[in-house]
């Protein structure tokens, strides 16, 4: 197979892999945007070409099996390449790859992002996808149909996680691997699951507080923090912790 690619690791025989090529493509695009050095754009395009010609599938999968973090990283890489070059092929792919993660049953369970595993890296996958999905939603040049779908899906996932958090246990309030069920107290808490849950709530909050989201036609609730009282609120306005006043 001809083209520029990176191996999964340094072991002999390690071949090209979406988990290295996707972030490499994204990083090269970001470096070009930062420094304007043409070689970075050349690398980004070559990584994109290898991914689309040899690894990504025509139905929207970035790899087999499809994993949320590579759907997100390669989708974000495509979005940035569109803004750099103005070429519509990148815009089209960005929408297809990120939308797949939220709408296809290979990445979802009962309409929510699925449980992808309990290891430290697997439990972090959704933490990678979420900010890139929100970036897509807030990008006025991306397809409005995909943006509307993603805004709704992100809110649905955030609502499910919030419903299943044991808020009475705060601050020992742990996120589950799958947001459609409560954290199992018989199991050790996962920092990866916590990172994914925090990424979801933080980035949905960012999405809800941005004016461009309103242009999608989707109403998004948001509760601004009360900086004077120090109170801590949830996205739906529930008081989590009473602040102290001096």
Set out the residue ranges of the language-model regions:
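Secretory-pathway/luminal and periplasmic proteins that interact with or process carbohydrate-rich
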Residues: 1, 53-58, 103-108
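Extended ligand-binding groove/face enriched in aromatic
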Residues: 1-31, 41-42
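Short clusters of hydrophobic/aromatic residues that line enzyme substrate/ligand-binding pockets
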Residues: 4-6, 62, 113, 218
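CBM-like carbohydrate-recognition segments
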Residues: 16, 96-213
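Noncatalytic carbohydrate-binding groove/subsite architecture in carbohydrate-active enzymes
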Residues: 22-23, 27-66, 72, 77-93, ...
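C-terminal outer-membrane/trafficking sorting elements
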Residues: 216-246
